[in-house]
């Protein structure tokens, strides 16, 4: 029941590219980003601090860094354009911000897919108090 409540709360704030990010994760990793990655480790979900706990958490850390490098963009609300060509996601469109955010989301979705074998349920709903180590630079 607690998980359903968390998902409902997270959906309240979802807009723009966050919906598209969920779609990319579903297409590439064949999993729901909300159900698998919205509250995982120290970096998957809102905020992020400490050190990534495993390869999956590192996907979120790198994604946060990628968003941080998207200068003059609001990554959580910018919509973007992409297509599928030969089973691959291709980011495009005329908006440089949108393309940059799409590339961040695409890389994270691929990272999630590639690290499914190392996903560890012990990091789901991981307590923030366990994420107090000095963060590494992006």
UniProtKB/Swiss-Prot annotation:
CDD domains membership: PLA2c (cd00125)
Record text on cofactor binding: Binds 1 Ca(2+) ion per subunit.
Known tissue expression: Expressed by the venom gland.
GO MF annotation: an example: phospholipid binding
Effect of residue 133 to Q: In the alpha form
SS bonds (residue pairs): 42-131, 44-60, 59-111, 65-138, 66-104, 73-97, 91-102
Cofactor(s) annotated in UniProt: Ca(2+)
Active site: 63, 105
Primary location recorded for the protein, binned into one broad class: secreted
EC code: 3.1.1.4
Record SUPFAM superfamilies: Phospholipase A2, PLA2
Entry-linked Pfam families: Phospholip_A2_1 (PF00068)
Subcellular location: Secreted
Stretch forming the signal peptide: 1-16
Chain residues that bind Ca(2+): 43, 45, 47, 64
Domain of life: Eukaryota
Substrates-to-products reaction catalysed: a 1,2-diacyl-sn-glycero-3-phosphocholine + H2O = a 1-acyl-sn-glycero-3-phosphocholine + a fatty acid + H(+)
Keywords: Calcium, Disulfide bond, Hydrolase, Lipid degradation, Lipid metabolism, Metal-binding, Secreted, Signal, Toxin
Example GO BP: negative regulation of T cell proliferation
GO cellular component: extracellular region
Family (UniProt): Belongs to the phospholipase A2 family. Group II subfamily. D49 sub-subfamily.
Function in brief: PLA2 catalyzes the calcium-dependent hydrolysis of the 2-acyl groups in 3-sn-phosphoglycerides.
Subunit structure: Dimer.
Protein known as: Acidic phospholipase A2 beta
Native source species: Crotalus adamanteus
Lineage, broadest ranks: Eukaryota, Metazoa, Chordata, Craniata, Vertebrata
């Amino acid at each position: 029941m607690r998980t359903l409540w968390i998902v409902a709360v997270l959906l309240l704030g979802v807009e723009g590219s966050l919906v598209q990010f969920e779609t990319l994760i579903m297409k590439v990793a064949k999993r729901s980003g909300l159900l698998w990655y919205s509250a995982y480790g120290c970096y998957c979900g809102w905020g992020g601090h400490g050190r990534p706990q495993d390869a999956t958490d590192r996907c979120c850390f790198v994604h946060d860094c990628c968003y941080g490098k998207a200068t003059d963009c609001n990554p959580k609300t910018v919509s973007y354009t992409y297509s599928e060509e030969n089973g691959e996601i291709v980011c495009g469109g005329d908006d440089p911000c949108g393309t940059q955010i799409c590339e961040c989301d695409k890389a994270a979705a691929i990272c999630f897919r590639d690290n499914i074998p190392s996903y560890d349920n012990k990091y789901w709903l991981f307590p923030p108090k366990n994420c107090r180590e000095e963060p590494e630079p992006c």
